[in-house]
Amino acid sequence: MLLPYLNKDLIEAGCDEAGRGCLAGSVYAAAVILPKDFKNELLNDSKQLTEKQRYALREVIEKEALAWAVGVVSPEEIDEINILRASFLAMHRAVDQLSVRPQHLLIDGNRFNKYPDIPHTTVIKGDGKYLSIAAASILAKTYRDDYMNRLHEEYPFYDWNKNKGYPTKKHRAAIAEHGTTPYHRMTFNLLGDGQLNLNF
């Protein structure tokens, strides 16, 4: 069972991203503030849910959350600042848009660039530990999936409606055959075995 909060007396926002390991498309992040008494048996790590379950949960989360928001960082920005910083920036943009200001942030992962004036705690595999991070994981993934499905209509060769921009054999074969699109991350190793070229 996922934990409802880390700090009972603080307004907490859970944050998570989607699309960090992709070769194409923006990186998305979500921030979610849930009521302290929020319960949902189905809510778990979004990677373990079916697509249908994720979209059903998105409706529940958006209806019952005290506040939620989604932040986006474009492929051009990713290439400019690197994917790790872009993931943090997407989370910052999500927090910026929250209608309720959180007093604490729960961040999925082990690193984060501090958000101004709001303390944070990083939680490794947090989407499998805290409800608010799991909720953020679902929003980030479903909104990014919607975006990749729209891009697929524009560029059907790359199979983005299925791989969502991740480095599958078919995706890499399409890059080799058709070249790149404006949505590909040009600082990534698009054809090789390595997924990321990170320059710190």
From Swiss-Prot:
Question: How is the cofactor bound, as the UniProt entry phrases it?
Answer: Manganese or magnesium. Binds 1 divalent metal ion per monomer in the absence of substrate. May bind a second metal ion after substrate binding.
Q: Which GO terms describe its cellular component?
A: cytoplasm; ribonuclease H2 complex
Which co-factor is required?
A: Mn(2+); Mg(2+)
**Protein's UniProt keywords contain Manganese:** yes
Sites where the protein binds a divalent metal cation: 16-17, 108
Q: Name one GO molecular function term.
A: RNA binding
Q: What catalytic reaction does the record list? A: Endonucleolytic cleavage to 5'-phosphomonoester
Give the UniProt keywords, A-Z.
Answer: Cytoplasm, Endonuclease, Hydrolase, Manganese, Metal-binding, Nuclease
> What SUPFAM superfamilies does the database record attribute to this sequence?
Ribonuclease H-like (SSF53098)
Return the InterPro entries for the record. Answer: RNase_HII, RNase_HII/HIII, RNase_HII/HIII_dom, RNaseH-like_sf, RNaseH_sf
EC class of the enzyme, as a word? hydrolase
Q: Does the keyword Hydrolase apply?
A: yes
Kindly list the biological process annotations in GO that this record carries. DNA replication, removal of RNA primer; mismatch repair
Which residues belong to any copy of the RNase H type-2 domain? 10-200
- Its Enzyme Commission number(s) read 3.1.26.4
Query: Which PROSITE patterns does the UniProt record give?
Result: RNASE_H_2
Annotated compartments = Cytoplasm
- Superkingdom of source: Bacteria
**Family in the record:** Belongs to the RNase HII family.
Q: What does this protein do?
A: Endonuclease that specifically degrades the RNA of RNA-DNA hybrids.
User: Which named protein is this?
Assistant: Ribonuclease HII
Q: What is the scientific name of the source organism?
A: Bacteroides thetaiotaomicron (strain ATCC 29148 / DSM 2079 / JCM 5827 / CCUG 10774 / NCTC 10582 / VPI-5482 / E50)
Task: State the taxonomy lineage.
Answer: Bacteria, Pseudomonadati, Bacteroidota, Bacteroidia, Bacteroidales
